Curated annotation (Swiss-Prot):
Zn(2+) binds at H46, E198. Belongs to the somatotropin/prolactin family. The keyword rRNA-binding does not apply. SUPFAM superfamilies: 4-helical cytokines. The lineage of its organism: Eukaryota, Metazoa, Chordata, Craniata, Vertebrata. This is Somatotropin. It comes from Anas platyrhynchos (Mallard). It comes from the Eukaryota. It is found in: Secreted. One of its GO terms (biological process) is negative regulation of apoptotic process.
Length: 216
């Protein structure tokens, strides 16, 4: 059976997640800071989960099981590793809110071009529905982060200018093993970067609003 030619439960989950984007806050009008954070966290959670499930679906469809461990140890270097972004919750706690927002913005913007080619990675392009939808979700999150930065910029010192890393486009020639491994590595980076953004936003939201049930 050709890869991507049938619907696995995971595949259905990916499609469902793509449709369940929070509609109650399609834009970021003037609103309380707590609401801005809540909306941004919700968007980051959806994108991270979508990226994780898509990575798993790609792995299931194209990477033989006996090669997965080896490939994971040699996956592509992530451009996000070239900036001094925190790698986890404890590191993020040491950064100011504005620093975390700047890191988040750089990570999001580094994927705006590559994701426009993402639907061509799968033989069945119903994964993600269309690249445009993923692009729009990233743009929404970018807008939310920028709204938070506008709210906080007068209260925080301006940090150093960050270099903006960029990722290669996804390769659509899936019969080529090098292309498969390149896309596998890119999807891994996409998942890792969105996990970082989700973590940063949760750290900021939790320490600002002191939620007793806060989980990161």
């Amino acid at each position: 059976m050709a890869p991507g030619s049938w619907f696995s439960p995971l595949f259905i989950t990916v499609i469902t997640l793509g449709l369940q984007w929070p509609q109650e806050a399609a834009t970021f009008p003037a609103m309380p800071l707590s609401n801005l954070f809540a909306n941004a966290v919700l968007r980051a959670q959806h994108l991270h989960l979508l990226a994780a499930e898509t990575y798993k679906e790609f792995e299931r469809s194209y990477i033989p099981e006996d090669q997965r461990h080896t490939n994971k140890n040699s996956q592509a270097f992530c451009y996000s590793e070239t900036i001094p972004a925190p790698t986890g919750k404890d590191d993020a706690q040491q950064k100011s809110d504005m620093e975390l927002l700047r890191f988040s913005l750089v990570l999001i913007q580094s994927w705006l071009t590559p994701v426009q080619y993402l639907s061509k990675v799968f033989t069945n392009n119903l994964v993600f529905g269309t690249s445009d939808r993923v692009f729009e979700k990233l743009k929404d999150l970018e807008e939310g982060i920028q709204a938070l930065m506008r709210e906080l910029e007068d209260r925080s010192p301006r940090g150093p200018q960050l270099l903006k890393p960029t990722y290669d486009k996804f390769d659509i020639h899936l019969r080529n093993e090098d292309a498969l491994l390149k896309n596998y590595g890119l999807l891994s980076c996409f998942k890792k970067d969105l996990h970082k953004v989700e973590t940063y936003l949760k750290v900021m939201k939790c320490r600002r609003f002191g939620e007793s049930n806060c989980t990161i």
